[in-house]
């Protein structure tokens, strides 16, 4: 199968899978309590996904070239043990000034990509909320901007995923494409579920939720196709040099972390800052069952990622 048909197939699968996962909370009628519980579970899924799936995948993609280099140096000696390959990679990294330098660069690259993603969402959030605050009263403005930022953050994140998949497809390595695709699907399905349950909890009508979901589901496939089609041969080579797949995934992890921790979690926990002032429970904070759901949500992506070996 050529690169174009494989990326088309992966894009369609991503669109359908993501949309179907997002319609599950819409298809079932939940009571207020169950909806809150599902929202908490969705928030946990978002956090666990960012920490247990996206960041490790991005780091793996960035270091893959060095690990591969260690692997190939033993190519003639037959089968190489994984531990030997790892030792190789370490010796490649530590041996000689040039490799030391590239090691430092990779470390910086990981941090910079994550921070840029987080700061980008922070700025988008501030710009978005300043527009909303000027028109409405503070409380409804906070809720509205929260809905917008959550959707926007996840769309930006999905777009970065799409770029990662497009860049991976342009390498012509089927294994890389499949790994990136599985990684993206592992967190896009829970993210779609989390987004829809959060928007339902925030009181959006169902038609608008479906529109939000469609935009989110379309972002990654569209960007994957555009990235793949827009890359010339020379830029493909340049991309594999700077390891664009890993950088794009880490950038999207930064946006994901912002959405999960700054928006969804405080919203679910009863408006974050407000419950400290109000004192007592008064419906604020999380019940024991909700805490269990949150922890469970964080652990599910971890279990899934452990199950999916490279």
Swiss-Prot record:
<dbReference type="GO" id="GO:0005385">
    <property type="term" value="F:zinc ion transmembrane transporter activity"/>
</dbReference>
<feature type="transmembrane region" description="Helical">
    <location>
        <begin position="108"/>
        <end position="128"/>
    </location>
</feature>
<keyword id="KW-0862">Zinc</keyword>
<keyword id="KW-0406">Ion transport</keyword>
<keyword id="KW-0333">Golgi apparatus</keyword>
<keyword id="KW-0812">Transmembrane</keyword>
<protein>
    <recommendedName>
        <fullName>Zinc transporter ZIP9</fullName>
    </recommendedName>
</protein>
<dbReference type="InterPro" id="IPR045891">
    <property type="entry name" value="ZIP9"/>
</dbReference>
<keyword id="KW-0675">Receptor</keyword>
<feature type="transmembrane region" description="Helical">
    <location>
        <begin position="246"/>
        <end position="266"/>
    </location>
</feature>
<dbReference type="GO" id="GO:0004930">
    <property type="term" value="F:G protein-coupled receptor activity"/>
</dbReference>
<dbReference type="GO" id="GO:0005886">
    <property type="term" value="C:plasma membrane"/>
</dbReference>
<dbReference type="GO" id="GO:0005634">
    <property type="term" value="C:nucleus"/>
</dbReference>
<feature type="transmembrane region" description="Helical">
    <location>
        <begin position="178"/>
        <end position="198"/>
    </location>
</feature>
<dbReference type="GO" id="GO:0048471">
    <property type="term" value="C:perinuclear region of cytoplasm"/>
</dbReference>
<dbReference type="InterPro" id="IPR003689">
    <property type="entry name" value="ZIP"/>
</dbReference>
<dbReference type="GO" id="GO:0006882">
    <property type="term" value="P:intracellular zinc ion homeostasis"/>
</dbReference>
<keyword id="KW-1133">Transmembrane helix</keyword>
<comment type="similarity">
    <text>Belongs to the ZIP transporter (TC 2.A.5) family.</text>
</comment>
<keyword id="KW-0963">Cytoplasm</keyword>
<dbReference type="GO" id="GO:0005739">
    <property type="term" value="C:mitochondrion"/>
</dbReference>
<keyword id="KW-0813">Transport</keyword>
<dbReference type="GO" id="GO:0005497">
    <property type="term" value="F:androgen binding"/>
</dbReference>
<keyword id="KW-0472">Membrane</keyword>
<feature type="transmembrane region" description="Helical">
    <location>
        <begin position="212"/>
        <end position="232"/>
    </location>
</feature>
<dbReference type="Pfam" id="PF02535">
    <property type="entry name" value="Zip"/>
</dbReference>
<feature type="transmembrane region" description="Helical">
    <location>
        <begin position="35"/>
        <end position="55"/>
    </location>
</feature>
<keyword id="KW-1003">Cell membrane</keyword>
<dbReference type="GO" id="GO:0071577">
    <property type="term" value="P:zinc ion transmembrane transport"/>
</dbReference>
<keyword id="KW-0864">Zinc transport</keyword>
<feature type="transmembrane region" description="Helical">
    <location>
        <begin position="7"/>
        <end position="27"/>
    </location>
</feature>
<keyword id="KW-0539">Nucleus</keyword>
<feature type="transmembrane region" description="Helical">
    <location>
        <begin position="148"/>
        <end position="168"/>
    </location>
</feature>
<comment type="function">
    <text>Has dual functions as a membrane-bound androgen receptor and as an androgen-dependent zinc transporter both of which are mediated through G protein activation and are required for the androgen-dependent apoptotic response. Upon androgen binding, mediates apoptosis by directly activating a stimulatory G protein that leads to increased cAMP levels and MAP kinase activity and which is accompanied by increased intracellular free zinc levels.</text>
</comment>
<feature type="transmembrane region" description="Helical">
    <location>
        <begin position="289"/>
        <end position="309"/>
    </location>
</feature>
<dbReference type="GO" id="GO:0005794">
    <property type="term" value="C:Golgi apparatus"/>
</dbReference>
<keyword id="KW-0496">Mitochondrion</keyword>
